[in-house]
């Protein structure tokens, strides 16, 4: 009993020495700490977003094998963009890159972009090819991407000027060759007959896959082509050298290639928004606006959802690899802590000008963060 009384006296003495406790003050201190923590988290996320955007710019140039962003003005883009059905279809299908992360898979992408469609505009050849004393259209230089992929389709697109009366048009595509003994300078590729009605001009496509494959096998045989589209009166309706008001009506080649799909594996993670108070590793939304960055050379998409990872990775949280937690338990001082990083990324499709003013439609791997985790 005496021991109990002694303990009570000691406890009361300690309370008196410590002085009165202000519960409101403790509550305010706790609230300030919480606010400071949230503020620090917001600042950290903002810095992470800025770093992510800069990293995306570097990755795009690297994956497209570009040392610098192509310097193409908006006026030049208006002149170079073909006003043709295949390009319009590619542009029309673009919205902000859709967020499709529900499958929970992790794509094993290669680093560099994989090309799906290449639109090649005519250019000047290394030599001046002339027939009957006049330069002939057209000569096409091909990207190295075409040579190392399987060509599944190659279309030559030509624009035919409008006619005033109904007429039949005879279209002829000729391949220029080295002069033969009999003086022949070209050989036929395709011929077709079209019926045109008065009104607007039309785009016509011609299959040139076989010719393209031959050119890729024997590049020295690529001397260019000649395009003719004669009406019943002998007038050439094909736009080969665009005149005033004919910007975007140049002939061009549309080449499609294919790539082998890759396997995937399963993974999961947390999703948050900018107002989230989640402290753990989480995926946050981030939209990259190429127009705001001044990258007019990217035709589409003008913006896409890139997302980013941010948050803490304590060892009590689920690790990407089971051995990570085991190693830390065995040697907690010798192992570095895990980082919040993407565990699932997906590609984006992009339509853009390369450094040679060719229009490329390709797939760039690992540009969208779909899942985040600690590893």
UniProtKB/Swiss-Prot annotation:
Keywords: Cleavage on pair of basic residues, Cytokine, Disulfide bond, Glycoprotein, Growth factor, Heparin-binding, Secreted, Signal. It comes from the Eukaryota. GO terms for biological process: myoblast migration involved in skeletal muscle regeneration; negative regulation of myoblast proliferation; negative regulation of satellite cell differentiation; negative regulation of skeletal muscle satellite cell proliferation; positive regulation of lamellipodium assembly; positive regulation of macrophage chemotaxis. Synthesized as large precursor molecule that undergoes proteolytic cleavage to generate an N-terminal propeptide and a disulfide linked C-terminal dimer, which is the biologically active molecule. The circulating form consists of a latent complex of the C-terminal dimer and other proteins, including its propeptide, which maintain the C-terminal dimer in a latent, inactive state. Ligand activation requires additional cleavage of the prodomain by a tolloid-like metalloproteinase. GO terms for cellular component: extracellular space. The record marks 98-99 as: Cleavage. The keyword Secreted applies. Glycans are attached at residue 71. InterPro entries: Cystine-knot_cytokine, TGF-b_C, TGF-b_propeptide, TGF-beta-rel, TGFb_CS. Gene3D superfamilies: 2.60.120.970, Cystine-knot cytokines. Disulfide bonds join 272-282, 281-340, 309-372, 313-374. Coiled coil: none annotated. Residues 1-23 form the signal peptide. Residues 24-266 form a propeptide. It is found in: Secreted. GO terms for molecular function: cytokine activity; growth factor activity; heparin binding; identical protein binding. Belongs to the TGF-beta family. Acts specifically as a negative regulator of skeletal muscle growth. Homodimer; disulfide-linked. Interacts with WFIKKN2, leading to inhibit its activity. Interacts with FSTL3. This is Growth/differentiation factor 8.
């Amino acid at each position: 009993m005496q021991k109990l009384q002694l303990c009570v006296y000691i406890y009361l003495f300690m309370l008196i020495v410590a002085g009165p406790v202000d519960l409101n003050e403790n509550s305010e201190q706790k609230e300030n700490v919480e606010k400071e923590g949230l503020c620090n988290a917001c600042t950290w996320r903002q810095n992470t977003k800025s770093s992510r955007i800069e990293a995306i710019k570097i990755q795009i140039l690297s994956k497209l094998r570009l040392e610098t962003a192509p310097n193409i003005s908006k006026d030049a883009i208006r002149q170079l963009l073909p006003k043709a059905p295949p390009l319009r279809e590619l542009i029309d299908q673009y919205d902000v890159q859709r967020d499709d992360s529900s499958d929970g898979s992790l794509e094993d992408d290669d680093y560099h972009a994989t090309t799906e469609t290449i639109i090649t505009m005519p250019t000047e050849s290394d030599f001046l090819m002339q027939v009957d004393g006049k330069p002939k259209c057209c000569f096409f230089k091909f990207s190295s991407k075409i040579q190392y992929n399987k060509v599944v389709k190659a279309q030559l697109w030509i624009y035919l000027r409008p006619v005033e009366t109904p007429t039949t048009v005879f279209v002829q595509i000729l391949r220029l060759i080295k002069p033969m003994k009999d003086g022949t300078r070209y050989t036929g590729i395709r011929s077709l007959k079209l019926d045109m009605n008065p009104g607007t001009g039309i785009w016509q496509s011609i299959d040139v896959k076989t010719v393209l494959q031959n050119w890729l096998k024997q590049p020295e045989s690529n001397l260019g082509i000649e395009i003719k589209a004669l009406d019943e009166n002998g007038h050439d309706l094909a736009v080969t050298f665009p005149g005033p008001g004919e910007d975007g009506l140049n002939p061009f080649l549309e080449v499609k290639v294919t790539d082998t799909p890759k396997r995937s594996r399963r993974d999961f993670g947390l999703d948050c928004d900018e107002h989230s108070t989640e402290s753990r590793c989480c995926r946050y939304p981030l939209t990259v606006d190429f127009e705001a960055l001044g990258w007019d050379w990217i035709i589409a998409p003008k913006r896409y959802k890139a997302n980013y990872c941010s948050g803490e990775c304590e060892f009590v949280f689920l690790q990407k690899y089971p051995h990570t937690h085991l190693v830390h338990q065995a040697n907690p001082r010798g192992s570095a802590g895990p980082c919040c990083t993407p565990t699932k990324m997906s590609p984006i499709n992009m339509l853009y000008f390369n450094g040679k003013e060719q229009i490329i439609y390709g797939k760039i791997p690992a540009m969208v963060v779909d899942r985040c985790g600690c590893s």
